[in-house]
């Protein structure tokens, strides 16, 4: 059953109406309901998103606050069955207070069946959540089980609301602070993208459908046309912090945006989707503006999940590396940096899609291994001419290796001796040439040809796709 465009449905329509929300998401005139409208609290439909057949469901905020009962959950499960059979992406538009209390355990069982359908679809079809109202209680886990979560400004995601938190723990918190988009974008990492408003949330969801389902092909001529001296974006001092995002956008196509995920959570790692020479790619980049670009427990976990997402959907990876190591500290050790850091090693180690590493300035220690190194079977490892590949920086290394020699030197000669030893150490063990000799770097490249080199390496590699679920690490 095809429905009318939103403007033809009637101006008096409640803005929470699921028919209106689905119409705002799908291409005009393409919406076909998958069942008759009812009081179940859910409306599911098929339609197109820029021509891509897509399945979507919307919890109905006008009926019991979108609470999920047996019938509504059945509609969602049926929508998933259709999407899996069609191999179509599925989008959930969420405005729900959780399970229907009046239906008791039956509702809980039905919500669990929705979760099972999501897990069954994981890694097989793209799942995108657009949260436009509450996603509370059991409904909070629906978006969390999907691949990408987009939150509108008025959305709220939490398992227990402020009143329960206050009565149990004594903590006084409002809904926005507890489960608003800024909270989940900065503190919890639940939210991948914060939209400007509800309509922008639908636009972001539509853009994601295109990136996942209209991946395109590498166009070498487009790569050459976009080549510029990206090296100029690095600061002159090798010790100065900088934001890596301009380098990322310079590598990617200028005519399409870079959709960064979880920008404010674990910000020392930048991840997101964009296009390189016409094709969808995933980008991971250390960001020296935050924590000097160090890996820590959260950024390693963030990167690991993103690698597995891209691998599950056959999206090649570009890994931009400028990393001094893992962030030291008691908080990191107690916060699980070993366990969570191992996730990134595992993610790259099992990754099957083409993945190319570019070392721009430095890569040291264990973080060198974790950032898609040759030892983890990177497709190619490129480095700019001044890059360092080492266990640690040369100055720090000689401070350990030649501690006694430096201590014995006259004080007025110590600094010059330290510089001399550091230069010698870098020549032997830390420069790009040494890494080339060993074979852990494939090629030293001119920064002005970065786009062409990355495109060529990814285009020549066999297209592959991992066969695994996308667990929300």
UniProtKB/Swiss-Prot annotation:
Induction is noted as: Expressed at higher levels during the exponential growth phase.
Q: What Enzyme Commission number does this protein have?
A: 2.1.3.15, 2.1.3.-
Q: State whether keyword Lipid biosynthesis applies.
A: yes
Q: How is its activity regulated?
A: Activity of the AccA3/AccD6 complex is inhibited by interaction with the epsilon subunit AccE5. Inhibited by dimethyl itaconate, C75, the herbicide haloxyfop, cerulenin, and 1,2-cyclohexanedione.
**What do the Gene Ontology cellular component annotations say?**
acetyl-CoA carboxylase complex; peptidoglycan-based cell wall
PROSITE patterns xrefs: COA_CT_CTER (PS50989), COA_CT_NTER (PS50980)
InterPro entries tied to this protein: AccD/PCCB, AcCoA_carboxyl_beta, ClpP/crotonase-like_dom_sf, COA_CT_C, COA_CT_N
Describe the disruption phenotype: Essential. Cannot be deleted. Limited expression level affects growth, mycolic acid content and cell morphology.
| Record-annotated CoA carboxyltransferase N-terminal domain positions | 2-224
Q: Which molecular function terms from Gene Ontology are attached?
A: acetyl-CoA carboxylase activity; propionyl-CoA carboxylase activity; transferase activity
Gene3D superfamilies reported for this sequence: 2-enoyl-CoA Hydratase, Chain A, domain 1
Q: Which GO terms describe its biological process?
A: fatty acid elongation, saturated fatty acid
- What residue ranges carry the coiled-coil annotation? none
Q: CoA carboxyltransferase C-terminal domain: from which residue to which, for each copy? A: 225-473
Pathway, according to UniProt? Lipid metabolism; fatty acid biosynthesis; Lipid metabolism; mycolic acid biosynthesis
The entry's (R)-haloxyfop-binding residues are 99, 138, 185, 334
Instruction: Identify the SUPFAM superfamilies for this entry.
Output: ClpP/crotonase
Give residues where N-acetylthreonine occurs.
Answer: 2
Keywords of the record, alphabetical order, are: Acetylation, Fatty acid biosynthesis, Fatty acid metabolism, Lipid biosynthesis, Lipid metabolism, Transferase
The reaction(s) annotated as catalysed by this protein in its Swiss-Prot or TrEMBL entry are:
N(6)-carboxybiotinyl-L-lysyl-[protein] + acetyl-CoA = N(6)-biotinyl-L-lysyl-[protein] + malonyl-CoA; N(6)-carboxybiotinyl-L-lysyl-[protein] + propanoyl-CoA = methylmalonyl-CoA + N(6)-biotinyl-L-lysyl-[protein]
**Would you identify the family this protein belongs to, as annotated?**
Belongs to the AccD/PCCB family.
Subunit-level organization: Homodimer. The biotin-dependent acyl-CoA carboxylase complex is composed of AccA3, which contains the biotin carboxylase (BC) and biotin carboxyl carrier protein (BCCP) domains, and AccD6, which contains the carboxyl transferase (CT) domain. The AccA3/AccD6 complex forms a dodecamer.
What else the UniProt entry mentions is:
AccD6 is dispensable in nonpathogenic strains.
Function, as annotated: Component of a biotin-dependent acyl-CoA carboxylase complex. This subunit transfers the CO2 from carboxybiotin to the CoA ester substrate. When associated with the alpha3 subunit AccA3, is involved in the carboxylation of acetyl-CoA and propionyl-CoA, with a preference for acetyl-CoA.
Supply the name of the protein: Biotin-dependent acetyl-/propionyl-coenzyme A carboxylase beta6 subunit
Taxonomic placement: Bacteria, Bacillati, Actinomycetota, Actinomycetes, Mycobacteriales
């Amino acid at each position: 059953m095809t429905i009318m465009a939103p403007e033809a449905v009637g101006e008096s329509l409640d803005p929470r109406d699921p028919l209106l929300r689905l119409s705002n998401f799908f291409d005009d005139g393409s919406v076909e309901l998958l069942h008759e409208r009812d009081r179940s609290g859910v409306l599911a439909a098929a339609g197109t998103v820029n021509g891509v057949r897509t399945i979507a469901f919307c919890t109905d905020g006008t009926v019991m606050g979108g609470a999920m009962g047996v019938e509504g959950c059945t509609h969602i499960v049926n929508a998933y069955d259709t999407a899996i059979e069609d191999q179509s992406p599925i989008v959930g538009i969420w405005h729900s207070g959780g399970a229907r209390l009046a239906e008791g355990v039956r509702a809980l069982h039905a919500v669990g069946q929705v979760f099972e359908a999501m897990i069954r679809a994981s890694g097989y079809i793209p799942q995108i959540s657009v949260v436009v109202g509450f996603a509370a209680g059991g409904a909070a886990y629906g978006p969390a089980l999907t691949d990408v979560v987009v939150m509108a400004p008025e959305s709220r995601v939490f398992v227990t609301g402020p009143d329960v938190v206050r009565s149990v723990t004594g903590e006084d918190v409002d809904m926005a602070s507890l489960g608003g988009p800024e909270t989940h974008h900065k503190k919890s990492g639940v939210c991948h993208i914060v939209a400007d408003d509800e309509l922008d949330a639908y636009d972001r969801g539509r853009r994601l459908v295109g990136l996942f389902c209209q991946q395109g092909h590498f166009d070498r001529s487009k790569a050459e046309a976009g080549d510029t001296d990206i090296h100029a974006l690095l600061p002159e001092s090798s010790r100065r912090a900088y934001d890596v995002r301009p380098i990322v956008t310079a590598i990617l196509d200028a005519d399409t945006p870079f959709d960064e995920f979880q920008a404010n959570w674990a910000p020392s790692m930048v991840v997101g989707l964009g296009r390189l020479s016409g094709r969808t790619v995933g980008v991971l980049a250390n960001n020296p503006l935050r924590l000097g670009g160090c890996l820590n427990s959260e950024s390693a976990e963030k990167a690991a999940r993103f690698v597995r997402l891209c691998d599950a959907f056959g999206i090649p990876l570009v890994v931009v590396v400028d990393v001094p190591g893992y962030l030291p500290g008691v908080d990191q050790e107690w916060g699980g940096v070993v366990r969570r850091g191992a996730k990134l090693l595992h993610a790259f180690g099992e990754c099957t899609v083409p993945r190319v590493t570019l070392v721009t300035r430095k890569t040291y220690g264990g973080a060198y291994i974790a950032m898609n190194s040759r030892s983890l079977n990177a497709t190619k490892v490129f480095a700019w001419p001044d890059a360092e590949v080492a266990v640690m920086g040369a100055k720090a290394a000689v401070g350990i290796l030649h501690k006694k020699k430096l201590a014995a030197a006259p004080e007025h000669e110590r600094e010059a001796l330290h510089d001399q030893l550091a230069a010698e150490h870098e020549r032997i063990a830390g420069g790009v040439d040494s890494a080339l000799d060993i074979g852990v770097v494939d090629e030293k490249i001119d920064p002005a040809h970065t786009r062409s080199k990355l495109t060529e390496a990814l285009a020549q590699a066999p297209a592959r796709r991992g066969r695994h679920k996308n667990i929300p690490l």
